[in-house]
Amino acid sequence: VDIPQIGVDALEGILGTRATLLDVRESGDYAASRITGTQHIPLADLPDRMDEIPSDQSVYVICTKGGRSLAAVDFLLHQGLTAINVIGGTAAWIESGRPVETGEPT
């Protein structure tokens, strides 16, 4: 299966549209820094929390650098969802100077 992928430049233009940005990192990483508006489901929890992911819109999946998100996208595609991997992950987002939220999510 070819995994659809997108870079952080293109992702910025999609944020705020009818799309879901799913962060699959562990809770500690997510609390340390995250893109505003992300939905958080750790990769290991994904199979048990599928009902939390909208099936009627594209799901952009992000992690720290792109490894876990690649596995998550592969899983979501096999579940029949439209899923896209974010190349470079949160690290690329931060390196490009874009803003993040920090601290425990409210």
Positions of predicted regions on the chain:
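Rhodanese-like catalytic fold shared by cysteine-dependent sulfurtransferases
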Residues: 1-20, 26-58, 67-106
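Short, surface-exposed ligand- or partner-binding patches at beta-edge/loop junctions that are enriched
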Residues: 61-62
